[in-house]
Amino acid sequence: MERKGHIIWIDDEIHHLKPHILFLEAKGYKITTATNGSDANILNQENRFDLALLDQNMPGIDGIDTLKKIKSHRQTIPVIMITKSEDEWLMDEAISQQIDQFLIKPVSPNQIYMACKQILEKNKIIEDKTTSEYLQDFQRINQDINFIKSLDEWWQLFLSLVNWQIKFDMQVDSNLHNILIDQTNECNKQFSKYVEDNYETLVSDNKTPILSPSVFKNHAQPSLDNGKKVCFIVIDCMRCDQFLSIYPYLESLFQVEMFYHLSLLPTATSFSRNAIFSGLFPDEMIKKYPKQRDSFLHNENGLNKYEEEYLNDQIKRLGNNDKKVHYHKIWALEEGKRFSKKINNYLEKDVIALVINFVDMLAHDSSKIDVLKELIPDESGYRKTVRSWVKNSWFNDVLKVLSQSNFDVVITSDHGSIKVNKEIMVSADKDASDGVRYKYGRNLNSKNKNVMKINNPENFKLPIFGPQFNYLLAKNDSYFLYPNAANRYKNKLQNSFQHGGISLEEMLIPVLKMKGISK
């Protein structure tokens, strides 16, 4: 029989526990016994036990002191205290010493077995169950993908994939990871076809208010209409999997509801984030704001420098002329700390709008800085880094303040990103935009099947800046290279996180609507 773990059982009346020991041994556990804390401490130093079962009332060294000695030798050993004492001070002391379970005698063999099983076999049971459930879901997803006809159905399918990705962060079975990666890639191919076939209709259909320009109106405006205050947070370039990875933590602070929106094409800040703050499509935006047109024409870096003005105009168009608004863009750590220290000063406003660039900076810098390449080698590393940032940065302090305030909170992103692997050669003149996953300019061309070519931008509510003006969008995990600099840029871009094109990760973006738990 396969040994499931080596347990040391410490009890001065161990002779009375022989039936329990035999029961555990029959279940596959190896049991070593000790009748006092001193002997147990020696045995613990000579053996690597997987679990300790411990009584409190023993002659000489009592259970709590024995626990401290055991933990001083190996801090991570799990311990179950099994004792007759029901004193609350003992329970508190055991908990403070990071005991794993507390059982009160008398206990049946099955009770002890279940406690041991939960600690020693939990990971294997979860892994086996996860594997079995995914293989069943794999078949369902493969069948569903052929019948998807709406964005809602794509969103539900994408959520399934993302939830499996997060569950697999705890798995060691790399083959299962690879199956999921292949399935996600196939779903992206089908999603790209859906977008090519339906995007033009989606942007022209007023009955589909799920695109970037409708985000504020759909999710923040209702709170203002009801006389409430709103903190509207856009975390640039944050992906769905990253939102879901922080969801449990957010639930510890807020009541959370999740919705979604579809990022505009190109999935780039200058298009999608401007659309969120202005409530307008890109072609409408440059007509209303000529200076935005000038920024596009000159390929300026500050293509989002008018967001505060756009948001104020949108709020007024929606009928809230009297609302006091504070807009704040955070692009560096020190700026975030300054905002966090002043957050209470802004709570008198009706609307706090916050733009955070940290996740976008991670995406772009991870291909340039060796330390970040180590931290973010893949999507899982990216998720863990973002989750750690949320829990340990100035942003966590802001969230805690908001959870205790009278603000409704909306968190979303303008677009996501995707890890790119396949280069596409593209021909363009020197005036073309320099995006890695999208390009716009005069007479752009590529014959690659992983490119969506838009020769009629007006039908897609995209701006036109001259004759023969068109757009190229990379699909799936592709990226653009110019032939004359292909090798130099391929080394930099291969396996990096980019955005601007068509993929589930870039286009399907969560919207989290949150209220403090105390409200």
Language-model segments: residues:
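Feature captures the catalytic ectodomains and active-site-proximal regions of enzymes
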Residues: 13, 22-23, 57, 92, ...
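Two-component/phosphorelay signaling modules centered on CheY-like receiver
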Residues: 14-32
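Acidic catalytic/metal-coordinating carboxylates
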Residues: 35-39, 62-65
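Short amphipathic alpha-helix used as the core "switch/output" element in two-component signaling
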Residues: 42, 64-75
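Active-site beta3 strand of CheY-like receiver
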Residues: 48-53
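Active-site residues of response regulator receiver
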Residues: 55, 83
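Alpha4 helix (beta4-alpha4-beta5 surface) of REC/receiver domains from two-component response regulators
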Residues: 65, 86-101
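A Lys-centered signature of the CheY-like receiver
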Residues: 105
